[in-house]
């Protein structure tokens, strides 16, 4: 039995390391491709720091850029960026397993275990079928999104360019990347040109939400259809938390930030800002015009991020929900954290606390360092670091002007936010043997 546990732990740890190494390899390949003269419009070699920052941002589906995607990168460079977004969003392991399966080779237990960790699945059983479902559904949704965006972009840009823009922005939105090609109108302008186009705003929002709720929720929807009562606890928590984190911030933006214009414009702007802030990084309004309270709320939303096993980053909605429920449990003086008539394990509660601690320390420390190095306001730098660690991509306009030190910090945060804090820690530390004996219990005062 002890031997089996050690083998299991060794495989478990290997899975985490495989995930990290696969992302590193993808970033390296992307960096080298973006450095090629064919990748830039000027047909010049892009510097290693600029190419690597772009590759990290694309692979980690963030959207922070130091070179405007539309005006600096050639069509080849844009295709490379889009492929990095697609593979990074779906997960390198997911794509790899699909290739192995298509070649007819057998998928072993180690590969299945790695896939399980990659998408935060509760068990190894059925993981291969789930992988096929994820890829097939993702491609279908992205194609539908591109088809729905095509009338708008083809009308504005012509058929050929419009189709390319439709595909690019559909994949970018679904993968929660936030990369855009509208620097042709004004560099780093995102979707501000379409701020009044309700149809386009709705399509982009739906793509963002679909990609951000997580692959496991899709699996429940496929299996149980509309019978929500049969959904797993995680799916219920994710759907409930996501709905709350869309509606409440939207109400704030509606009443306090967008307090001018028609009801329709205020509603669509508020909803879009609420949806995109947690994961995607598109913006239709000038973020620098927001007051400090609005900026602070956006920082919190970016830190929370998307859902487990999704294309998004951040602490995750489930983590936020567990932290909230554990606080309620303490205040009500109960022993167990409960939700939807189920008990949440102490391991999940402790993991949520560890994730919160890591994110807050990294986010705040990095913001302070960048503020000192760049001599910029702390709130502006905290906005940037929360955007990076949440893999969101929103910025107050300082990214392209940052020094090498600050860019390295942002790259580390983006990688941390995409791969996951616990994955990095588990990969770096040796597995702990289970303790057969427990130490004496002693109380300590807190609060």
Task: Label each region the model flagged.
Residues 1-447:
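Membrane-proximal intracellular helices of multi-pass ion channels
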């Amino acid at each position: 039995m002890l031997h089996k546990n050690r083998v299991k732990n060794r495989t478990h740890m290997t899975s985490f390391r495989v995930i990290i190494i696969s992302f590193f390899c993808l970033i390296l390949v992307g960096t080298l491709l973006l450095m090629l003269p064919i990748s830039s419009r000027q047909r010049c070699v892009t510097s290693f720091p600029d190419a690597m920052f772009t590759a990290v941002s694309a692979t980690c589906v963030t959207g922070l850029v130091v070179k405007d995607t539309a005006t600096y990168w050639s069509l080849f460079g844009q295709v490379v960026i889009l492929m990095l977004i697609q593979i990074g969003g779906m997960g390198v392991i997911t794509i790899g397993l699909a290739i192995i399966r298509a070649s007819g080779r057998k998928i072993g237990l180690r590969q299945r275990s790695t896939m399980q960790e990659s998408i935060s699945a509760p068990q190894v059983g059925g993981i291969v079928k789930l992988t096929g479902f994820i890829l097939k559904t993702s491609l279908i949704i992205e194609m539908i999104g591109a088809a729905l965006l095509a009338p708008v972009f083809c009308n504005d840009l012509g058929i050929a360019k419009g189709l390319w823009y439709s595909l690019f922005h559909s994949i970018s939105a679904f993968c929660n990347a936030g990369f855009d090609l509208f620097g042709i109108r004004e560099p780093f302008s995102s979707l501000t040109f379409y701020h009044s186009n309700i149809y386009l705003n709705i399509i982009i929002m739906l793509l963002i939400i679909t990609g951000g709720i997580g692959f496991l929720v899709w699996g429940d929807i496929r299996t149980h259809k509309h019978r929500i009562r049969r959904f797993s606890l995680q799916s219920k928590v994710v759907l409930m938390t996501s709905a709350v984190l869309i509606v409440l911030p939207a109400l704030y933006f509606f009443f306090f930030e967008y307090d001018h214009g028609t009801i329709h414009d205020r509603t669509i702007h508020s909803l879009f800002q609420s949806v995109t802030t947690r994961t995607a990084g598109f913006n239709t309004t000038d973020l620098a015009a927001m007051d400090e309270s609005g900026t602070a709320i956006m920082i919190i939303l970016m830190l929370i991020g998307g859902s487990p096993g999704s294309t998004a980053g951040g602490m995750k909605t489930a983590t936020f929900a567990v932290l909230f429920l554990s606080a309620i449990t303490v205040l009500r003086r109960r022993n167990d954290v409960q939700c939807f008539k189920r008990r949440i394990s102490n391991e999940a509660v402790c993991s949520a606390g560890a994730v919160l601690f890591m994110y807050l320390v990294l986010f705040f420390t990095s913001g302070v360092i960048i503020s000192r190095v760049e001599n910029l306001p702390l709130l502006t730098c905290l906005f940037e670091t929360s955007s990076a660690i949440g893999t969101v991509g929103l910025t107050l306009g300082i990214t392209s002007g940052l020094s090498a030190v600050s860019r390295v910090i942002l790259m580390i945060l983006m990688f941390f936010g995409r791969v996951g804090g616990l994955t990095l820690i588990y990969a770096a530390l040796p597995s702990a043997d289970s303790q057969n004996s427990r130490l004496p219990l002693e109380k300590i005062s807190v609060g």
